[in-house]
């Protein structure tokens, strides 16, 4: 299965369907099923923006080091001024990403939680994970 590691709280925002676009500095041609892994990296939760993001979640419990959901990666869009201005119309989505000209918007749909969550060490880029049988 294809997996993308994302720092918390952004991974849990995707899993809880509060965020549908992941903003990255690199593009991908991959389309299809993508699992979201919450990386082990901890951020400073005293940051004002992080505090606002945490208010969107039903719980402040983070999922560090776990594969937590699956979704469909349906598009990867180069961010230009027009695209960014359109996203600004959705204040919550805009607040949840890093929208700058030259970055990429990975469009995610059909997000589903997985149960149980899978403990795993993350990796950079899209990576493969095989479930032990």
Report the location of each language-model feature.
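Structured alpha/beta reader/binder surfaces that contact nucleic acids or chromatin modification marks
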Residues: 1-133
């Amino acid at each position: 299965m294809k997996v993308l590691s994302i720092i918390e709280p952004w991974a849990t925002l995707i899993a809880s369907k509060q965020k549908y676009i992941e903003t990255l500095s690199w593009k991908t041609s991959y389309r299809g099923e993508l699992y979201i892994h919450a990386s082990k990296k901890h951020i400073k939760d005293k940051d004002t923006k992080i505090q606002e993001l945490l208010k969107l979640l039903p719980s402040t419990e983070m999922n560090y080091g776990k594969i937590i959901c699956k979704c469909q990666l349906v598009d990867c869009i180069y961010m230009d001024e027009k695209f960014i201005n359109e996203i600004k119309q959705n204040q919550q989505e805009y607040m949840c990403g890093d929208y700058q000209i030259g970055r990429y918007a990975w469009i995610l749909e059909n997000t589903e939680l997985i149960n149980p969550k899978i403990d795993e060490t993350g990796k950079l880029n899209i990576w493969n994970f095989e479930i032990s049988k």
